[in-house]
Amino acid sequence: MADRFTKMHGLGNDFVVIDARVAPVEMTPARAHAIADRRHGIGCDQLILLEPSTSADVKMRIFNADGGEVEACGNATRCVATLIGKPAVIETLAGMLRVTPADGGAEVTLGEPVFDWDHIPLAMPMDTRDMPVAWDELEHGAAVNVGNPHIVFFVPEADAVALDQLGPRIETDPLFPERVNVNVASLDGENQLQLRVWERGVGLTQACGTGACATAVAAIRAGLVRSPVTVALPGGDLVIRWAPGEPIVMSGAATRVFDGETDWAQFG
């Protein structure tokens, strides 16, 4: 019997979604990496494995293209919400996420952002609102954990930054013991941000939902914008709502591209 999957994307951030709630699927980092390979596998930024949960409607496991299992992915959560098709609670390594499908997408309620340096985590104590760091033109980053670790830099022109070169340097810097997602943003009108993201374990992406959340939170915290914030990514827009002491709410599109069949055994 063939193994089934669904190919989806959230603003160009693409996923192979495997529903293993009835028929279990053994997933290893090596197998996830092989499936995500765009030349020899199916190809995706992340592989999403849905499993039964004893405390939520479904458990969602997330594997980056390099095979590493990670805590959270906002775009994938919206995609899974549209597959479920009704309000639901999704269990992740980052905690419980509440989702509500909407026309062409979904709304996701994440937890509250975390700013403590040791919970980002960083390798040393530091003011996460204005970090005294510099990698070439990227200086004074803000660190936020929104279920996974992010550093945010505000610059005059996000498109002018050589993120393909600086991203991997910052991601793997010893300051970040669990590596980090790198966000470069610029103001793009009242309560609007332009954002590019180097995603940990993936690279440059068309969109990153948790990156949009982290960047909007950092911008609100710095007094640059007010909620709700429209975040423009290469793949499209997300709307982020947040106030201090409250959870983050993200809204945006999710697209089902096609359903397919394969044999997972061929991927190791």
Curated annotation (Swiss-Prot):
- Catalytic residues of the enzyme: C73, C208
Please provide the record's keywords in A-Z order.
Answer: Amino-acid biosynthesis, Cytoplasm, Isomerase, Lysine biosynthesis
Q: Where is this site: Could be important to modulate the pK values of the two catalytic cysteine residues?
A: H150, E199
Q: What is its EC number?
A: 5.1.1.7
A single BP term in Gene Ontology? lysine biosynthetic process via diaminopimelate
Q: Could you list the residue ranges forming a coiled coil in this record?
A: none
One Pfam family this sequence matches: DAP_epimerase
Q: Which reaction does it catalyse?
A: (2S,6S)-2,6-diaminopimelate = meso-2,6-diaminopimelate
UniProt pathway annotation: Amino-acid biosynthesis; L-lysine biosynthesis via DAP pathway; DL-2,6-diaminopimelate from LL-2,6-diaminopimelate: step 1/1
Amino-acid positions noted as binding substrate in the UniProt annotation, renumbered to this chain: N13, Q46, N64, G74, N75, N148, N181, E199, R200, G209, T210
GO terms under cellular component: cytosol
Subunit structure of this entry?
A: Homodimer.
Q: Member of which family? A: Belongs to the diaminopimelate epimerase family.
User: Know the name of this protein?
Assistant: Diaminopimelate epimerase
In the UniProt record, what gene is named as encoding this protein? dapF
